[in-house]
Regions:
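Short C-terminal domain-edge/linker segments immediately following a structured domain
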Residues: 50-55, 93, 138-144
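A generic structural signal for short beta-strands and their flanking turns/coil linkers
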Residues: 21, 29, 87-91, 105, ...
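Hot-dog-fold acyl-thioester-processing enzymes
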Residues: 2-87, 149-154
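Conserved hydrophobic positions within beta-strands
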Residues: 22, 95, 109-111
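HotDog/MaoC-like acyl-thioester-processing domains
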Residues: 1-17, 100-154
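Mid-chain, well-packed structural core segment of small domains
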Residues: 79-101
Length: 154
């Protein structure tokens, strides 16, 4: 795999990687996401609740919102694609492992394939999020649309 900073559709190759920003997860960052999303589920806020009857999930304490992973992936794709006039059109993710306060996570994209049509150019990207131990905590697939040279969007 080759790390890419290019957003030139023609020079992108299958296997090129896109690195995203690292994110240090804290109780405060989890609380701020609760406030932003209006999701005050005790999964994200209440250690006692997580250790009680619900504790059979074995999380052992509060966990970060899965949508926070989604947002980090979206930020990575937007930071990479937007300068070229490209737009994230689709993102599907699956949460694999809970993320807890004290974890540091980082999204990564891997170019899977490219396709050109008369009206647009498409890049399919495998995405994943890893924690500080190299464990995958989320995985998925994204589609980014690049404008055709000479089009109004280009």
């Amino acid at each position: 795999m080759t790390k890419t900073t290019t957003t030139d559709f023609d020079t992108l190759r299958d296997g090129d990687t896109i690195d995203g920003p690292t994110f240090a997860v804290s109780r405060e960052s989890i609380r701020l996401f609760c406030d932003a999303s209006l999701d005050y589920n005790p999964l994200h806020l209440d250690d006692d609740y997580m250790k009680g009857d619900f504790g059979r999930t074995n999380f052992g304490g509060i966990i970060m919102h899965g949508m926070n992973n989604f947002g980090l992936i979206t930020r990575m794709l937007t930071d990479w694609a937007y300068p070229a006039g490209a737009i994230q059109r689709r993102l599907e993710t699956r949460w694999l492992k809970p993320v807890k306060p004290g974890d540091t996570i980082e999204p990564i994209g891997v170019v899977k394939s490219k396709q050109s049509t008369q009206k647009s150019r498409w890049v399919l990207i495998d995405v994943l999020v890893r924690n500080q131990n190299g464990e995958q905590v989320a995985t998925g697939e994204a589609m980014v649309e690049f404008p055709v040279p000479g089009s109004i969007a280009a």
